[in-house]
């Protein structure tokens, strides 16, 4: 047991050193109990590109909540940590650092550059692990993995070779998405489409005989040097007689043919389309059909090459301006038509993606997708939470394209293909024997290795590996909806292909962390928040409580410091309740408390309030467990908050003072037992969410770590509807009296007469038997409970289930004075309503103010109207009393 709780809750003191203690005690490792059911999670590996953000904190908090609860429930739990090499992202970061020193990766060469990247990886991996510790993540570091570990690399090579041998990986020249900044290919889902201002540039291509011109339009005139034809629809009567003739490509005066192809739409524009097979996917397909040459006019960095004539070496966008100016000077520019269109941008570097002809490696997706789709109709299907994301997954799998997996980078899994001087290619898990072989310089898409994460981390391809046999398939994956396509889908089809099983049973999808205004957090907006800064101010438990309590599967969460204040206040409340209970504990042990509680539920000792709180505790255990099973942590948090603050702290703890401040030692022991037992159960329920503070308090009265303590279970013997119904009626009575006092502005300290009329004999007896509680909470001068009470002429009346409550007002209230006070209050609310109404009737304000500002004013209006109406009602009531 640890030292006594400090008078004030200080998260820094509570959390300092605790994580290292857990690590020293090995409490995060699997139990090794072969009789226990296994439950495993693999952490979505963060990129070693920098520090973790608030989204990572949310993602890992949810996983930790799940694994801590399952550990307490007796499962043999494994939460496997690890990190992703993040090829393009990490390489870009290291290259940026080198540029600041005036060095490029080419200056260093591949081997020395990779040494620099490994240094970066070690630096940021240490930072990430430190942040995991601050968050309190109960991962098993003895099983930590990295996507470039040799074991995982072996798995990657095997998967590549097996798919290649099946004909499902192939190499070919196709139009791909090219990132000129990173100088690498991108898959379709690594391209973010944004609406940008652009233009259609209309230009004339003159027939070779000079008889007429054909007007074509393009958004990328700089690619015209790669034009190898113009196409018209074979059924378009305007151009039928021109098919087979040539037009002259402006600026370079090169003749290119007019071809017939249905790609040209007679209804769109002039019906004439320029064909640039090396720079447009549709044109590439046309070129394939007509056996056209493929002319690439750009370098891999987005500059124009020597085929662009005088524009050689210019950046593509500068070349665009220069080409348009040249066309205008030559008389070939017809018009510029401004418009907004969707343009692809690199997810990693943010630059405009260039469609580019390139030789790349691809995964053929047809059969892999069919397997994944078919699996969702079996007992082995992956369950999505919420279920609507199954539709998202299925839609993507049904419409998936072949996956370009090669990247023109140095950091990553180098493609296991080798070439010799004779033009031969060898694909294998190991290098070919003999000299003269050169390995493909490209690396694999990061997501290729990440797709194997759930089983490669468990020892696969060794299917006899202990962890693979014990913990695969994994139980639950927690991740954001933004990477269902990138990662979740790929893990599913790769796992089905190579293990014959789904990679995980459940996928919990969460949303994004947004700021108070609902905006996505980003560097450009400057609204990003470092979770470590939040932890420094509020503690990890408060952040974890906010992240869990504010979340519903699939929904976004808005971060606010107001919510963080509320989270801290809740933990502070728990701390203060705990201090009160432990200070009055008088050496009572948890085992003694359990024995006494058993007697309470059997009605051998204790009072009705003891049985009421134990009944409600039991209901809370059931509801929280059910919510956890559905991954509805926000619902669980609401249930816990209400029970702890409202029922336990505000009611039961206050009710116990009646006993604890008495001279009855036997009753005191029972009350202390119920208090300690209930606190213990609360801490166990809270531990998965608030590990640090619950461990600190648990250590005051129990041995060992709460990490390995058993999780509460529903106990049928605790159910007591009679006690529940009785105390709820008692609470209703007390609340009613308090509300009536407040309505007529009578101070709680002023003694009053309370008359309770009920025809329910059981309720009458219950109220009389527990009148001490009524008196403690309502401060009556006189309390009368009877079925024979007659309502006084001047009284506040309220009705609860089974009873009427009268508060005689004759000696308490000057009706005239109260009416005058209420009239002033009414005028105040009318003034507020006039002010907000004037603002909302201002069309300029409504049109120009931020939506959230307008909504705030509308909320004020609703609040003021409610208060205005309530005041009117009170005035009418006072007038009625006055007339009576």
Curated annotation (Swiss-Prot):
Annotated keywords: Aminoacyl-tRNA synthetase, ATP-binding, Coiled coil, Cytoplasm, Ligase, Nucleotide-binding, Protein biosynthesis
Residue numbers covered by motif 'KMSKS' region: 520-524
Gene3D superfamilies: HUPs (3.40.50.620), Isoleucyl-tRNA Synthetase, Domain 1 (1.10.730.10), Valyl-tRNA synthetase, C-terminal domain (1.10.287.380), Valyl/Leucyl/Isoleucyl-tRNA synthetase, editing domain (3.90.740.10)
Coiled-coil region(s): 809-844
Subcellular location: Cytoplasm
GO biological process: valyl-tRNA aminoacylation
Predominant localisation class: cytoplasm
Binding-site positions, ATP: 523
Pfam families documented for this protein: Anticodon_1, tRNA-synt_1, Val_tRNA-synt_C
Motif 'HIGH' region positions after renumbering to this chain: 46-56
Domains as described in the record: ValRS has two distinct active sites: one for aminoacylation and one for editing. The misactivated threonine is translocated from the active site to the editing site. The C-terminal coiled-coil domain is crucial for aminoacylation activity.
Self-association state and partner proteins as the record states: Monomer.
Protein name as it appears in the record: Valine--tRNA ligase
């Amino acid at each position: 047991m640890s030292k006594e709780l400090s008078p004030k809750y200080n998260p820094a003191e509570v959390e300092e050193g605790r994580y290292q203690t857990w690590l020293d005690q090995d409490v995060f490792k699997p139990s090794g109990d072969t009789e226990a059911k296994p439950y495993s999670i693999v952490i979505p590996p963060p990129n070693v590109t920098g520090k973790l953000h608030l989204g990572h904190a949310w993602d890992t908090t949810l996983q930790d909540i799940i694994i801590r609860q399952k550990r307490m429930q007796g499962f043999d739990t494994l939460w496997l940590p690890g990190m992703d090499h993040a090829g393009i992202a990490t390489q870009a970061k290291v290259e940026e650092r080198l540029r600041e020193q005036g060095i490029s990766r080419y200056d260093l060469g591949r081997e020395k550059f990779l040494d620099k990247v490994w240094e970066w990886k070690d630096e940021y991996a240490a930072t990430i692990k430190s942040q995991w510790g601050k968050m309190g993540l109960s991962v098993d570091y003895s099983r930590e993995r990295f996507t470039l570990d040799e074991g995982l690399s072996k798995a990657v090579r095997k998967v590549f070779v097996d798919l290649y041998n099946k004909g499902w990986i192939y190499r070919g020249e196709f139009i791909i998405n090219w990132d000129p900044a990173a100088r690498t290919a991108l898959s379709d889902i690594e391209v973010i489409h944004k609406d940008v201002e652009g233009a259609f540039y209309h230009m004339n291509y003159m027939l070779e005989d000079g008889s007429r011109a054909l007007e074509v339009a393009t958004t990328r005139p700089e690619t015209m040097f790669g034009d190898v034809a113009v196409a018209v629809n074979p059924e378009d009567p305007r151009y039928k007689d021109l098919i087979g003739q040539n037009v002259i490509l402006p600026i370079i005066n090169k003749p290119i043919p007019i071809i017939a192809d249905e790609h040209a739409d007679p209804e769109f524009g002039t019906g004439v389309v320029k064909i640039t097979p090396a720079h447009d996917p549709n044109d590439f397909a046309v070129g394939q059909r007509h056996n056209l040459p493929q002319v690439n006019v750009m370098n891999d960095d987005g500059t124009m090459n020597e085929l662009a004539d005088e524009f050689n070496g210019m950046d593509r966008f500068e070349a665009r301006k220069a080409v348009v100016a040249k066309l205008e000077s030559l008389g070939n520019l017809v018009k510029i038509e401004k418009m907004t269109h969707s343009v692809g941008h690199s997810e990693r570097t943010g630059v405009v993606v260039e469609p580019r002809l390139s030789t790349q490696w691809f995964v053929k997706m047809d059969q892999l997708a069919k397997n994944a789709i078919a699996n969702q109709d079996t007992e082995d299907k992956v369950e999505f939470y919420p279920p609507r994301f199954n539709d998202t997954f299925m839609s993507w799998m049904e419409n998936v394209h072949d996956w370009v997996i090669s990247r023109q980078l140095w950091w990553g899994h180098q493609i296991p293909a080798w070439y010799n001087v004779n033009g031969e290619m060898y694909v294998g898990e190991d290098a070919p024997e003999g000299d003269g072989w050169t390995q493909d310089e490209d690396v694999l898409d990061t997501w290729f290795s990440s797709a194997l994460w759930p089983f490669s981390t468990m020892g696969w391809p060794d299917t006899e590996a202990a962890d693979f046999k014990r913990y695969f398939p994994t139980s639950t994956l927690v991740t954001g909806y933004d990477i269902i396509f990138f990662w979740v889908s790929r893990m599913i089809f790769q796992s089905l292909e190579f293990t014959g099983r789904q990679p995980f049973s459940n996928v919990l999808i969460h949303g994004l962390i947004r700021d108070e205004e609902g905006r996505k957090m980003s560097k450009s907006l400057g609204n990003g928040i470092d979770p470590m800064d939040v932890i420094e101010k509020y503690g990890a438990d408060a952040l974890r409580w906010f992240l869990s309590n504010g979340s519903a599967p699939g929904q976004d969460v808005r971060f606010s410091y107001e919510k963080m204040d509320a989270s801290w206040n809740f933990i502070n409340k728990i701390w203060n309740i705990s201090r009160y209970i432990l200070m009055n504990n008088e050496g009572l042990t948890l085992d003694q408390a359990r024995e006494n509680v058993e007697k309470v539920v059997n009605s051998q000792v204790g009072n009705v309030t003891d049985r009421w709180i134990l009944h409600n505790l039991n209901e809370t255990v059931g509801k929280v467990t059910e919510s956890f099973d559905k991954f509805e942590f926000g619902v669980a948090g609401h249930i816990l908050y209400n029970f702890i603050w409202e029922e336990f702290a505000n009611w039961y703890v206050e009710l116990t003072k009646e006993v604890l401040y008495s001279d009855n030692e036997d009753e005191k022991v029972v009350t202390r037992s119920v208090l300690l037992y209930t606190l213990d159960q609360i801490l166990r329920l809270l531990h998965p969410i608030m590990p640090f503070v619950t461990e600190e308090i648990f250590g005051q009265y129990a041995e060992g770590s709460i990490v390995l303590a058993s999780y509460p279970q529903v106990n049928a013997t605790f159910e007591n509807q009679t006690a529940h119904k009785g105390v709820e009626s008692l609470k209703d009575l007390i609340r009613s009296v308090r509300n009536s006092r407040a309505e007529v502005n009578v101070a709680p300290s002023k003694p009053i007469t309370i008359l309770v009329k009920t025809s329910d004999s059981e309720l009458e007896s219950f109220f009389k038997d527990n009148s001490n509680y009524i008196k403690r909470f309502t401060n009556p001068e006189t309390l009368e409970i009877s079925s024979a009470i007659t309502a006084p002429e001047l009284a506040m009346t309220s009705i609860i289930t089974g009873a009427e409550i009268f508060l005689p007002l004759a000696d308490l209230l000057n009706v005239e004075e109260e009416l005058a006070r209420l009239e002033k209050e009414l005028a105040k609310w009318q003034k507020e309503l006039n002010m907000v109404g004037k603002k909302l009737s201002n069309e300029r304000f409504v049109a120009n103010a931020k939506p959230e500002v307008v909504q705030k004013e509308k909320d004020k209006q609703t609040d003021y109207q409610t208060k205005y109406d309530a005041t009117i009602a009170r005035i009418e009531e006072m007038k009625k009393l006055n007339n009576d």
